[in-house]
Amino acid sequence: SIKSEDSSENKALMLLSCIGNKAKVITGCAKGAEGFVTGMHGGIDHTLVYFKEEDLENMSIGDTILVKAHGQGLAVDGHEDVKCMNIDPNLFEKFGIKENKEGILEVPVVTEIPAYLMGSGVGSATAFSGDYDIMTGDNEANKEFGIDKLKFGDLVLLRDCDNTNGRQYLKDSVSIGVI
């Protein structure tokens, strides 16, 4: 995970970074190593970046990592009612999202999560930064909704969850999240 000591720089990093954005180490022994943004952790304001294990072995605290932030403001042609956030357009294209005969977008999610299982992150002022957690200790819910089988990169539908202007419950709304 990465974080700038400068609060305003870190807020910009958290706000503008999108999953799938390219990241490159530009100082230190791992200079030139490339990775990509995988998410954020709002509680500690860290941007999460994947690098190969051998590159991580050459990194040290204080190395500078350049994130090519791209994707906030992404729009889907013909679907002005859909709000995209926090995703690199190149990654978005790889998700296999299709438009059906009725003009409705179909997203290949692996499961649906009901609003009552969404926890930490609810009530945040914006969904453009931070994270949003599926939270349950209920073994039956874990099995019923396939939570126990989720993997990094899986797409999930969040039922009755609206993230347009912060995170909130809104009956009949849907949000798509990436694990």
PLM regions and their residue ranges:
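Conserved mixed alpha/beta catalytic, RNA-binding, or beta-rich assembly cores of soluble enzyme
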Residues: S1-I179
